[in-house]
Amino acid sequence: MKHFTYRGDKAREISFPLGGLGSGCLGLGGTGQLVDWEILNRPAKGSRNGFSHFAVKAEVGGRVLDARVLQGDATPPFSGEGMAPFTGFGFGAPRETMGGLPHFRRTEFRGGFPFAEIRFRDPKFPGQVSLTAFNPFIPHNERDSSIPAAFFTITIRNNGRRTIDYTAAFTVRNPASGGTVNRLRTVDGMHVLQLSGGAGPDDPGYGDFALATDAGGVAAQEYWYRGRHFDNLGVYWQDFSAPGPLPPRAYETPGQADHATLSARVRVPAGGEAAVRFVFTWNVPHCRNYWKEQKECCGEGKTCPPPTWKNYYATLFPDAAASAVYSLREWDRLENETRLFRNALFGSTLPAPVLDAVSANLSILKSPTCLRLEDGSFYGWEGCHADSGCCEGSCTHVWNYAYALPFLFPALERSLRELDYRYNLGPDGGMPFRLQLPLGSERSGFRPCVDGQLGGVLKVYREWKVAGDTEWLRRLWPDVRRSIEFAWSPDNDDRWDPDGTGVIHGRQHHTLDTELFGPNAWLTGFYLAALKAGAAMADACGDPETAASYRAIFERGRKWVGRNLFNGEYFIQQIDLKDRRILEAFRGEGAGVAGEAWAVPAGEYWSEEHGELKYQIGEGCGIDQVLAQWHADLIGLGDIFDRKQTRKALRAIYRRNFHRSMRDVANPCRLYCLDDEAGTVMFSWPPGRKRPAIPVPYAQETMHGFEYQAAGHLILNGMVEEGVAMVKAVRDRYDGYRRNPWNEMECGSNYARSMASYALLNAFSGLRFDMVMREIGFRPVPTRDGRFRCFWSLAAAWGEIEIGPREAVLRVIRGELSIRRMTLPWSGAGSVTVMLRGRRLPCRRRGGVFDFGVDVTIPEGAALRVAASR
């Protein structure tokens, strides 16, 4: 795991998120500090929770050999942070960094999500210390993967020649509002230090917290010393660094943000090792829409507090103590199952940058970007501002790219589809792309976007094929059909395709936050893919006439795009930038932009100075021009565009948009790539091609989700070296020194679109699936030794696939997989032997297709073995 190890300055930007799915998180810093306390139902980037930290000490015969805070050297800035009086810039590094107390000289951070490990070394400390941290991440187990907790194990190895008594301590400042109360409890032999405040359980601001251990030799200090100036930290360190257990301290009256410490003492013989487990849990049950002012009317002249809803985790656990006890009681199972996933993922024979990208961006699911609503449904921001979510509403045109959730937690992805069609679909078939909270709020007033609305059709198709649940599809189909037919509806003010040509000509809102006018392969591709997917779903739902209609429109559009939008090298936008009349059709009803603060008023799409339409692509080479084909390849939909044209376009994206150094690239937009860093820009205009005076926004940026999809699409089409180079360019930028490896940015931190990286896994394995027909297949990228191993996951099960020149093993680690047919990358027609749990199965072979004739069920823990002759 050398590739995922960070030392020295390469650990300075690390904040490794520890928390549940939609439950909030806190961050483990690169040298051991606890940062980014995002546990109060909103982001809190850069936050510290007082003097919260871990510490260790070593004693022999009543004499303290050494005591240290369990972290490394403080990281810049050393002159101070922020502008607060007496503590900001000019007052030195914040005391809360714990940099003023003895700490370890060297640290080494090893990250392989969902686990992080830090190794601490100091010549003065008699022992080798490590801290391992995780939160359960178990595919398909949404409940245990949503526990609001951070799990920590401190392991100490005595490498000396005498027995040593070690103490491991965990300190947390009580973050509850109101007068804070800290109380130690014992539950079934587990020690729980519960932190609460003055608010009642039904108060919208209520929260309680707990730190707990199942270790022996426990001592607790419920309260640090209450004093002035620097008294509390100073007295604490005197107490901890003295021989023996921490002295207890209690106060009869509630305090304000009191610290509490829980410790455990272990005796370790020479050459021995001991571990102490701690868990920190939180319970902040009540959510509200803090980003928009909402007040319920209680009668004339009166207002009520904003409406609230509960976090999903609050329906599982009554308080933080309950989740702490559950976490400790189930720790072994939760850790073992998380390690099963981690080992399967990291056992994949993928290039290191690809494995890095896939694994690191799974952490987005554990960040404050994600929420789970009271019934367990999933909801997502686009990303995070420093102290609030960024861009609300499970934004469909952003979450289109996020491929992790539908394969790892497919039930949660299906909940996104269900909420979208239930709450966003309008009477005319149009769908706003942002879901409003609380559920049932008035729909967004902004116009539908092409990629978001029609991408939703592709996602319904994907979820249907991943799970094989046609009954689920039938329930959604009437709404899905209405959303497709909105394209030619007379009620569509944007006039996407009023004549049913298969090509979108009208006003086209999209994920780059503006409108295109005129046909382009990028957005028309979504339309074509939705028509093709819609036809297949219509057939499955007993609607053959609709299916035939969709296919006819699809074929017309596909032919037109190939003939009119491909310039011989790549796909362009067909538009006369000098024709102001294009805008005239959209000045009437529906031309407004209410609901999106950043949106461009209709009258501002014309530049008088340049005599041109603004925010268009024209003859540019766009990174997303064949995006719909990427989706289609991943979900088994087949060709949307001419395959030869698609491959030429992909080669053009690599040749024109990928830069090995950004030093000489002019970028007036946001800076995600600097100096000699490599990256792939959104658009380029090759020599001889007309560049709009004011092109589409973000044109020169390097946005990672787009980079990943382009890279994955190259890999899917055999351009593996080029695709890996693009992936490596992104991950090299997140090296721990310049940026946090577990926080990819776009419109904010922990950005959802970066989960396009998960699709790299399926691209390398060549995963093919149709659980409706009980089919699974793999066509992996060839390796030097002809052997390939990779993690896979579908709705019913997850596991590993191993493929060699003439043998393959399909292993189910969790769940149960029923298949009738399997495809492998083998040619020929030789004999085949298929074994399951020691029993040979009948099988008919046609080249690389192995047909079992009946459903074959691979149970949990079993493997299907296929051996073929030449």
Model-inferred region functions:
Residues 386-430, 478, 514, 525-540, ...:
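Active-site core of glycosidic bond-cleaving carbohydrate-active enzymes
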Residues 1-79, 345, 358-361, 365-368, ...:
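Beta-strand-rich N-terminal accessory domains
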Residues 143, 151-153, 221-225, 234-237, ...:
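The feature captures the catalytic groove of carbohydrate-active enzymes
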